[in-house]
Regions:
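Noncatalytic, beta-rich nucleic-acid-contacting surfaces in large DNA/RNA-processing enzymes
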Residues: 1-280
Length: 280
């Protein structure tokens, strides 16, 4: 009933039930995208230790960020209940040293939690030592005029921002390099439309999530690859021919694939004919 009539809240509940499981969280994020449910980056002043719904949007939880977890998220929320964080200095002044260290703040910056403070992410990270030094003496001074000047830096490239997000979430939450690849290769098929191409050859651009290798009866190596684009997932099948041709595919790569769409146990898969690695 909840899934049919209140899909937004249903997905929020599933996401909250998956906190601590990167794999399940990623799966539910893909479900949200397939169902046009918007999930936005966490906010240091709006997010909680759980996922919440606001303005028909799921706001990602602080707890689901790598190296943050529930305890630190709750500590941030507890401090915020005394008043919203005014800026990065106010945040560091109020939470730094209370189980929250420099690495935690770096992760929060890379996750996009501090974007609302008006500085780009590279500027925040490059000034972090300055900010922390101030936080260690600022409570004694109580004088805003003594705050150091922020030195501005050009923002990370779009690809660097995406990689940083991947590092802190384990998946792409806001931007996805697959989108950039599709702009360069207009004949790419979206995975959520793969059912329209059954028994046909297609070109897809995917992120390699995991690789499972097996041996055939003849002792040859073949593999099954779990892959994804911005919206959906699919299984790729690589037969021994690829290993004889010295094709090497690694987890975490983005690849262009040409292959035939087949169906096995009611699930679509692609039997791969050609593979090309994409450097981003």
């Amino acid at each position: 009933y909840l899934k049919a009539h209140y899909p937004l809240y249903f997905m929020k509940q599933l996401l909250n039930g998956s906190i601590g499981s990167e794999t399940k969280t990623k799966d539910y994020i893909y479900e949200c995208k397939k169902n046009n449910i918007k999930v936005i980056l966490p906010s240091i002043n709006k997010s909680y230790d759980i996922h919440i719904v606001r303005d028909n949007t799921i706001i990602f939880s602080l707890s689901s960020i790598k190296n943050i977890g529930t305890n630190i998220a709750k500590q941030i929320v507890f401090e915020r209940e005394k008043g919203s964080f005014k800026d990065i200095f106010d945040f560091a002044l109020r939470v730094y040293g209370k189980s929250i260290n420099k690495k935690h703040i770096e992760v929060l910056i890379d996750a996009g939690c501090m974007d609302e403070f008006g500085y780009n992410r590279k500027t925040l990270k490059e000034n972090l030592d300055l900010i922390i030094n101030y936080s260690e003496i600022g409570s004694l001074l109580d004088d805003d005029e003594l705050r150091p000047e922020i030195v501005f830096y050009n923002e990370y490239t779009k690809i660097e921002l995406m990689k940083n997000e991947l590092n802190v979430y384990g998946f792409y939450l806001s931007n996805n390099p697959i989108t950039e690849v599709k702009l360069k290769y207009p004949n790419i098929v979206n995975l959520n439309e793969i059912n329209l191409y059954f028994d046909k050859f297609v070109n897809i651009a995917v992120y390699v999530d995991s690789i499972r290798e097996i041996k055939t009866k003849n002792g040859d190596k073949m593999s099954f690859i779990e892959a994804s684009d911005e919206i959906d997932k699919i299984e790729l099948v690589l037969f021994p021919k690829f290993y004889r041709d010295n094709v090497v595919i690694k987890e975490g790569e983005i690849i262009l694939v040409n292959g035939k769409v087949e169906k096995r146990f009611d699930k679509y898969q692609i039997v791969v004919s050609k593979v090309k690695e994409i450097n981003i």
